[in-house]
């Protein structure tokens, strides 16, 4: 039997006044989406002088104001956070949400997240090494009551985690990764692997890919993850394949037909979770050259017309 499809919304409500952020998240929940995700940056990445709330604090508040939808950060980085603190934050949200946390982790790379928090910018090799240690710490702390870890970059000594996670053995772990080094970490630890429908190099260059090129790139990543899973002794099917959509020229937000076509093409190569951007209207035009996002009408149409058919 094929794996159940899941559909989420990436909604950067950190940009919005808190009461509006709550309303928007409750609206997504009411429509029946499976998950809702926040970003994690110190500064607003679209308009640098606009508001930007901290992700874990806001996620905890949203957890207390929703009841069904699963909640996560896509993805939380360790640039300004010790891994033990991330584990404790995750456990707290896990309990506030009554077991609805999706734990999303990534290596982080935005320069302003370093400079604005007084953390020197890491070289790529150090970033990956730090990420590997951090994931190992968080994974262990959320599984066990006591953790000791002696790494090159992070040390945890007799760290106590009580109460235990409501979800066992820990909240589901999503690792965002597109390069070989971080995908190998995903192969070892993740329950779900998330990637973009574009390569990181093309994203940094501000490109959007034609549909078939993007599909081919995702298929190549998918095959690589299978290979890395086998090397660490895991079954490839143990890791859900998750896609953050909107970087292609032909976007799923164009129409209901485009949405169906997008989902079917990526489902055919093994993706079973789809996360779509919904930005506030005043931001959509600012990112249009790099990112295709949903508007409210499309958020509603997909929920009422497409999701019941696809599930």
Descriptions of predicted regions:
Residues 1-311:
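Active-site-adjacent structural elements that line small-molecule/cofactor binding pockets in enzymes
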